[in-house]
């Protein structure tokens, strides 16, 4: 593409992504996992977050043992320098901004190496991917920053493989691809599977610079350096390597056939839709998606094997198919159960393969006609579900986990941040309450994480000077039901606290149950 086409398609693609994902951003409620990276951000406005915050020398380094507080830090800068008040709109916009920026950078980096038709096809495939749209808007994985980094990675790969420039000027690109993979692993350890794409990249670009791999390894080491430091620190304290602390041999109960189907049909967004909206598209769409994508990838492989000596684009398309297949093999090897927010790491490698193959098949008219027909079918078939998803975004349709009542809970928490204490008796409400209070210290507790939740809540309430206590129950996690009941029983039987009717505004909170306790006269 020429410079004008590159700028134009980059801007249009980024704008389209925003338009498709930013409709009524507060219509769905805030989900617990969606906000798990937010508490650490309040460190930057003077709070002392404990939830999902693993500090190193006082600075939040990790949100989980396997994920870095990068998004937390960026949003923390927003709170400190732009607007000190948390909102679900600004939080969701940050994830959208990540992907929009990544998409823009992809076209700017790879634009000179792409045909216009390839760029358009790549954009259409990515922007019609329901999983991409839903997980970008509702970044519970998290997935948004990781997708942005992969877009940059693929852009650099295309530039390295197809750009005619050789020599030392390319070495910074090798260093940068290594850095991007390193940052991806730092952002979430499950992205370690990107070592496979990095290896394939180095193989496909080895003629560009024989020492390029050294620069890539250097970039990789630099990107993962904070993670290495964190693990050395925990090991030195006798706690072992923190990133391996949640490794398990449990791989879940998903069968091989079901996994392959879910992997190939991810573009229809069946699993994200079920989680966010509580609905699932007709199975026909999923099977058609899987069949169409498989057919396209087979055509690419067949063409690449026949034309590997003559077409660099076809060879590269074949490399992207190999990457997509390698990632499918890699995910089950992760020592932890995986789900759609892990599998989406394979996107958009498959789209890069399809986009590259389109102009490269020009010499094989029959194969090209079939390829174009299937690609058009794949995109058109997504349109009905794309329309449904956009309508769901706008209308506020939601599952119990994303019920709009969670946004109401956040607003109610904000009004009680000075005079009340909140207890989340089970999983699913604490991050929302904490963010609603704008990072109020010692404001919300989760006793269910402890073996004796009843004693934990007695200890918490005996140390507070607040006179009002709200107990929030979501019922989402059945495994916490007994702990939740024990917490409520401990307060009901307490001589210090007595049950009281909740205020009218707390009474209508959908699937969320809220109980109020006030300090008794005897407790005074």
Predicted features by range, described:
Residues 19-20, 35-80, 236:
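Extracytosolic helix-loop segments that constitute the early lumenal/periplasmic catalytic or substrate-binding loops
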Residues 10, 89, 93-114, 152, ...:
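Transmembrane-helix motifs of polytopic, lipid-linked glycan transferases
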Residues 69-73, 81-101, 139, 283-291, ...:
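Loop-to-helix entry region of an early transmembrane alpha helix in multi-pass inner-membrane enzymes
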């Amino acid at each position: 593409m020429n410079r004008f086409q590159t700028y134009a398609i980059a801007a249009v693609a980024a704008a389209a992504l925003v338009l498709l994902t930013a409709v009524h951003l507060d219509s769905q409620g805030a989900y617990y996992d969606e906000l798990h990276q937010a508490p650490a951000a309040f460190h930057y406005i003077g709070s002392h977050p404990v939830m999902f915050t693993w500090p190193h020398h006082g600075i939040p380094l990790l949100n989980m043992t396997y994920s870095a507080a990068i998004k937390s830090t960026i949003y923390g800068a927003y709170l400190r320098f732009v607007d000190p008040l948390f909102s679900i709109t600004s939080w969701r916009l940050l994830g959208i901004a990540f992907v929009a920026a990544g998409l823009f950078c992809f076209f700017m980096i790879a634009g000179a190496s792409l045909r216009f038709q390839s760029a358009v096809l790549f954009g259409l495939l990515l922007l019609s991917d329901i999983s991409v749209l839903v997980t970008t808007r509702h970044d519970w994985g998290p997935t948004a920053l990781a997708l942005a980094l992969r877009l940059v990675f693929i852009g650099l790969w295309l530039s390295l493989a197809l750009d005619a420039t050789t020599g030392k000027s390319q070495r910074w690109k090798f260093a940068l691809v290594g850095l991007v993979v390193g940052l991806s692993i730092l952002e979430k350890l499950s992205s370690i599977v990107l070592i496979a794409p990095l290896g394939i990249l180095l193989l496909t670009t080895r003629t560009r610079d024989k020492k390029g791999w050294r620069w890539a390894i250097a970039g990789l080491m630099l990107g993962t350096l904070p993670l290495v430091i964190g693990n050395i620190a925990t090991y030195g304290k006798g706690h072992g390597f923190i990133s391996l602390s949640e490794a398990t041999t449990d791989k879940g109960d998903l069968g091989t056939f079901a996994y392959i189907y879910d992997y190939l049909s991810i573009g229809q967004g069946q699993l994200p839709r079920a989680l966010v909206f509580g609905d699932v598209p007709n199975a026909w769409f999923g099977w058609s998606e899987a069949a169409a994508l498989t057919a396209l990838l087979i055509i690419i492989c067949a063409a690449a094997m026949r034309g590997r000596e003559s077409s660099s684009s076809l060879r590269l398309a074949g490399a992207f198919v190999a990457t997509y297949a390698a990632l499918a093999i890699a995910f089950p090897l992760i020592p932890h159960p995986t789900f759609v927010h892990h599998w989406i790491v394979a996107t958009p490698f498959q789209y890069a393969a399809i986009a590259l193959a389109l102009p490269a098949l020009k010499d094989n008219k029959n194969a090209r006609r079939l390829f174009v027909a299937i690609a058009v079918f794949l995109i058109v078939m997504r349109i009905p579900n794309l329309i449904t998803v956009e309508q769901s975004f706008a209308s506020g349709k939601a599952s119990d986990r994303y019920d709009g009542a969670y946004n109401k809970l956040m607003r109610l928490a904000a009004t009680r941040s000075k005079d009340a204490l909140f207890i989340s008796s089970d999983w699913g409400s604490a991050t929302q309450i904490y963010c609603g209070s704008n990072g109020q210290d010692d404001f919300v507790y989760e006793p269910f994480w402890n073996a004796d939740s009843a004693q934990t809540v007695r200890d918490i309430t005996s140390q507070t000077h607040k006179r009002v206590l709200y107990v929030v129950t979501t019922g989402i996690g059945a495994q916490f039901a007994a702990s939740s009941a024990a917490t409520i029983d401990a307060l009901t039987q307490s001589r210090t606290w007595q049950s009281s009717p909740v205020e009218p505004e707390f009474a209508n909170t959908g699937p969320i149950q809220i109980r109020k306790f006030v300090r008794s006269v005897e407790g005074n």
